[in-house]
């Protein structure tokens, strides 16, 4: 059975927790946050940023982590009129696009660097997500970058 890659980022003294809001169609990372706690606050901040900067989705899919089932998180989605979808418990394949981003991030960035602290991890991950969105082509997108594919879709939809 496939196992989730977990969005835990190793640092010299412990772990940081990563959340990313990803557009499934284009694979574009719309917003992300890194935190030293699993509280829902950093997830809510990433969600609010994505909703402020990009068109509202019809459906929002997450796993059943406590930060995503928290009232603080789900109330933002409900307040925006977004349908909440959650993966089956322990079914990482239900959220395959997010799992793929975690795998790419870990093998192309995180495992290649030893972050001393949260600031260093945040800088490295920020550079990687810029690369991922703007430079790294995806076979499933016809070898376009997520950003180019997203913007192409947005242009034709307008």
Where are these regions (language model features)?
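Charged DNA-binding/catalytic regions of mobile-element recombinases
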Residues: 1-158
């Amino acid at each position: 059975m496939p196992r989730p890659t977990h969005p835990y980022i190793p640092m010299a003294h412990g772990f940081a927790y990563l959340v990313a809001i990803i557009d499934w169609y284009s694979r574009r990372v719309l917003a992300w946050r890194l935190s030293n706690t699993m509280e829902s606050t950093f997830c809510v901040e990433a969600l609010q940023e994505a909703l402020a900067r990009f068109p509202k989705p019809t459906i929002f899919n997450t796993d059943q982590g406590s930060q995503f089932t928290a009232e603080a998180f789900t109330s933002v989605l409900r307040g925006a009129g977004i349908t909440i979808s959650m993966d089956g418990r322990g079914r990482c394949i239900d959220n395959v696009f997010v799992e793929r981003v975690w795998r790419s991030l870990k093998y192309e960035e995180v495992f290649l660097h030893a972050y001393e602290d949260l600031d260093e991890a945040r800088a490295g991950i920020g550079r990687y997500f810029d690369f991922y969105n703007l430079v790294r082509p995806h076979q499933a997108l016809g070898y376009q970058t997520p950003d180019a594919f997203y913007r192409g879709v947005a242009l034709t939809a307008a």
